[in-house]
C-alpha cells in the first residue's frame, strides 16, 4: 500500500445471523449518483422476504461467504481511478407462520400458514469509477455491473400443503457520467445515466394436499423437476400421475409460471446555477426514457418518455431560508395513448427566531404514473396463493404533502425539544380490488377515483445532567391513516390509528459502569366499514444494557422484554438475554459471548394493517456461544 496505489482484499464468512450484504454495499460506494431518480426494475415473482419486528441477529439462520478486491490509483493530485470486484454466496433458512384475518365487505376470511423457506443467493458485482476534481471543473465516470442469482424453496402447510420454488435472477449494467464547470458565480454541467436490467424468473407450485410422508414428497418433487425424462410439457395444467418403485401416487396438481422481464432506463440533463445577492438561481432541463417488456405466454412492452424542466430559487439570510421549485413535466406512454402535461411545485421556509428557537414549513404537490407492474394486462401467479391481473390502464397518483416543524435548543442546560406535524392527501384514478376464492387471493385494478389521507404528530424531548452523567429522552408519535378498499365491487372505508412512546435513559455513575434503558410502547387499532372495530392492542419492547469496563476488559449484559397483546384476552411475554466479555492485550483482542441465554425458541406477535390482522410466529436462533481471537498488525 502506498499513497498513489492502495489495494484491499477481504474475505468474510458468517453463520451467526449477521447480514454481510450491507458490508459489500458499503464497498461499492460509487453507486450513489447525484440528482438521478431511477425507478426500480419491475419484479413480478418476488422471493419471500417477511418483515419481522426483531433484530436480524435473532432471526437470521444463514451461511454467508463474501470476497472482494478493491484497487485505488491516484493518478495525480486531482485524478483517481478505482476498481472494485465482489462476490457473495449466501444460504438462508427461515421458519415462520401466521394466522390472518381479512375483513372483506361481505365476508371475513381466515387463513393459516406455516412456512419453512430455504433461500440461496449468489451475487457478482464490479465497478470502475474515475474522478477528476480540478479547480474549475469536476468529472466523474462510473460503470458498474451486477449479476444476482436467487432461488427459494418453501414447504407450506396450513389450509393447504404446498411446495413452492421461485428462481429469480437479475443481471444489470449501469453507466453514469457527470461533467461540471464553475466560473466565478456560475456553475453549469451535463449528466447522463443509463441502466439495463434483465430479470428472468420461474415459479413452480406443487399442491400436496395428500398425507404422504416427507420422504415421498422429496421423491415426488425430484420426479416432477425431471420433466424431460418424463416427456411432459413445460406447463402442466392437469393432474399428473407418478409411478416410482412400483408404487402409484395420487394426482398432484402442478403449476408453472415463467416470466422474463427486460427494463432499460435513461436520464439525461443539462443544469446551470447562478448566485447573486445571496439568491441562488438554478435551472435543470432533461429527458427520461424507459422501455419495459415482459415475455410470458404473450409478449408485452411499455415504452415511456418524458421531458422536464426544474426552475429553482433559493434565498438565504442569517435568520431565514426560502426555497421554491417547480418541476414541469410532459409524459408520454404511446402504447397506452396516454400523455400528460403537469407541474409539481414545492415550497420550503425556515425561520430562526433566536439562537434557541427555529421553525420550518413545507408543502409540495407531485404526480406520478405507475410502472409496467401496474399496467400489465395479462393474469399471472405471483406466488402459491396470489393471482394478479390489471386493466392495462395507466395508474396516476397525485400527492399533496404539508409539514410543520418547531425546535427549541438550550445547550447550556442540555435541553432539546422538537415538534413536527404532517398531513398527506393522495388521489388515485385506479382502485385495487382483492377477492378470495378456493384458497387464492385475486388482485386486480378497477377504474374508480378515490383518496387516502394520513396525519402524523411527533414530539421529542431530551434532557441531560452533566454532573450526573445522565441523558434522558422521550419521543411521542401519533398517526392516523384513512383510505378505501374494494371487494366484490363494494367499497369500504378503513381507518388505522397508531400511538408510540419511546423513553430512553443512559446513566454512567462512574467511568467503569454504564446503564442504558430503552423502551418502545405502541398501540394500534383499526376501524373497517361501519360495523368492524378491531380492539386496540398494546406492544411493549424494553431493553436494559449493563456495561462494566476495567482497564483492558469490558463486560456487557443485556436483557430484552417483549409484551404483546395477541388478542383482547390473550397476551404473551418473551424474555431474551445476551452477555459478552472482551479483553484487549496489545494487538490482540479476545471475545467471548453468549446469545439467547434463556434459549427461547419462538416469538409471537399480532399486528394490524389497514384491512387485516395477523398473528405471526417466527423461530429464533437457539442459545449460542462464540469465542473469537483477533490480531492486528
Predicted regions: what is each one?
Residues 1-151, 164-193, 215-222, 275-278, ...:
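Membrane-proximal, glycine/serine-rich, low-complexity loop/turn segments characteristic
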Residues 54-60, 113-119, 162-168, 255-261, ...:
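Outer-membrane beta-barrel domain signature
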Residues 9-15, 40-48, 94-110, 152-161, ...:
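Outer-membrane beta-barrel translocator domains and adjoining extracellular loop/strand segments
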Residues 64-90, 117-335, 352, 415-423, ...:
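Face-selective signature of the C-terminal outer-membrane beta-barrel domain
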Residues 499-633:
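Conserved C-terminal beta-signal and adjacent last beta-strands/turns
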Residues 1-4, 135, 333-339, 366, ...:
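Solvent-exposed loop/turn segments connecting transmembrane beta-strands
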Residues 396-442, 451-453, 465-477:
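Membrane-embedded beta-barrel scaffold of Gram-negative outer-membrane proteins
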Residues 1-3, 324-334, 390-394, 402, ...:
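Transmembrane beta-strand segments that form the barrel wall of outer-membrane beta-barrel proteins
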Amino acid at each position: 500500500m502506498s499513497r498513489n496505489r492502495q489495494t484491499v482484499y477481504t474475505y468474510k464468512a458468517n453463520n451467526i445471523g449477521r447480514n454481510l450484504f450491507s458490508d459489500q454495499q458499503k464497498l461499492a460506494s460509487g453507486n450513489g449518483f447525484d440528482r438521478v431518480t431511477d425507478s426500480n426494475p419491475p419484479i413480478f415473482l418476488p422471493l419471500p422476504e417477511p418483515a419481522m419486528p426483531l433484530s436480524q441477529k435473532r432471526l437470521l439462520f444463514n451461511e454467508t461467504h463474501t470476497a472482494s478486491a478493491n484497487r485505488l490509483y491516484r493518478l495525480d493530485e486531482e485524478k483517481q481511478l478505482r476498481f472494485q470486484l465482489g462476490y457473495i454466496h449466501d444460504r438462508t433458512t427461515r421458519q415462520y407462520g401466521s394466522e390472518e384475518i381479512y375483513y372483506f365487505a361481505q365476508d371475513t376470511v381466515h387463513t393459516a400458514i406455516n412456512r419453512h423457506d430455504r433461500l440461496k443467493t449468489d451475487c457478482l458485482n464490479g465497478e470502475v469509477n474515475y474522478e477528476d476534481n480540478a479547480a474549475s471543473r469536476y468529472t466523474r465516470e462510473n460503470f458498474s455491473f451486477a449479476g444476482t442469482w436467487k432461488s427459494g424453496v418453501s414447504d407450506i402447510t396450513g389450509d393447504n400443503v404446498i411446495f413452492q420454488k421461485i428462481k429469480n435472477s437479475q443481471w444489470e449494467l449501469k453507466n453514469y457520467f457527470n461533467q461540471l464547470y464553475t466560473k466565478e458565480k456560475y456553475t453549469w454541467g451535463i449528466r447522463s445515466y443509463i441502466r439495463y436490467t434483465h430479470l428472468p424468473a420461474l415459479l413452480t407450485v406443487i399442491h400436496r394436499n395428500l398425507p404422504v410422508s416427507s420422504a415421498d414428497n422429496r421423491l415426488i418433487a425430484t420426479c416432477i423437476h425431471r420433466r424431460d425424462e418424463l416427456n411432459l410439457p413445460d406447463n402442466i395444467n392437469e393432474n399428473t400421475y407418478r409411478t416410482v418403485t412400483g408404487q402409484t401416487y395420487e394426482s398432484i396438481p402442478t403449476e408453472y409460471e415463467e416470466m422474463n422481464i427486460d427494463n432499460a432506463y435513461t436520464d439525461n440533463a443539462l443544469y446551470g446555477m447562478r448566485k447573486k445577492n445571496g439568491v441562488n438561481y438554478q435551472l435543470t432541463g432533461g429527458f427520461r426514457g424507459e422501455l419495459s417488456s415482459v415475455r410470458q405466454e404473450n409478449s408485452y412492452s411499455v415504452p415511456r418518455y418524458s421531458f422536464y424542466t426544474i426552475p429553482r430559487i433559493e434565498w438565504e439570510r442569517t435568520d431565514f431560508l426560502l426555497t421554491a421549485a417547480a418541476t414541469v413535466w410532459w409524459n408520454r406512454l404511446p402504447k397506452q395513448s396516454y400523455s400528460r402535461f403537469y407541474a409539481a411545485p414545492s415550497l420550503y421556509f425556515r425561520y430562526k427566531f433566536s439562537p434557541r428557537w427555529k421553525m420550518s414549513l413545507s408543502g409540495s404537490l407531485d404526480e406520478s404514473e405507475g410502472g409496467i407492474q401496474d399496467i400489465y394486462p395479462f393474469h399471472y401467479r405471483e406466488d402459491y396463493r396470489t393471482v394478479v391481473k390489471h386493466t392495462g390502464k395507466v395508474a396516476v397518483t397525485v400527492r399533496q404533502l404539508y409539514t410543520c416543524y418547531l425546535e427549541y435548543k438550550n445547550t447550556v442546560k442540555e435541553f432539546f425539544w422538537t415538534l413536527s406535524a404532517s398531513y398527506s392527501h393522495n388521489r388515485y384514478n385506479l382502485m385495487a380490488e382483492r377477492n378470495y376464492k378456493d384458497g387464492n387471493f385475486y388482485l386486480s385494478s378497477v377504474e374508480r377515483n378515490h383518496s387516502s389521507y394520513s396525519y402524523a404528530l411527533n414530539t421529542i424531548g431530551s434532557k441531560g445532567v452533566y454532573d450526573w452523567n445522565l441523558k434522558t429522552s422521550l419521543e411521542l408519535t401519533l398517526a392516523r391513516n384513512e383510505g378505501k378498499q374494494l371487494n366484490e365491487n363494494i367499497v369500504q372505508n378503513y381507518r388505522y390509528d397508531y400511538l408510540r412512546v419511546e423513553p430512553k435513559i443512559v446513566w454512567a455513575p462512574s467511568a467503569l459502569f454504564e446503564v442504558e434503558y430503552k423502551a418502545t410502547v405502541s398501540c394500534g387499532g383499526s376501524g373497517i366499514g361501519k360495523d368492524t372495530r378491531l380492539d386496540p392492542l398494546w406492544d411493549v419492547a424494553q431493553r436494559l444494557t449493563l456495561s462494566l469496563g476495567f482497564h483492558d476488559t469490558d463486560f456487557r449484559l443485556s436483557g430484552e422484554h417483549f409484551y404483546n397483546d395477541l388478542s383482547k384476552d390473550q397476551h404473551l411475554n418473551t424474555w431474551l438475554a445476551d452477555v459478552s466479555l472482551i479483553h484487549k492485550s496489545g494487538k490482540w483482542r479476545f471475545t467471548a459471548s453468549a446469545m439467547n441465554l434463556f434459549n427461547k425458541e419462538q416469538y409471537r406477535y399480532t399486528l394490524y394493517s389497514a384491512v387485516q390482522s395477523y398473528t405471526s410466529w417466527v423461530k429464533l436462533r437457539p442459545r449460542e456461544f462464540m469465542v473469537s481471537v483477533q490480531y492486528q498488525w
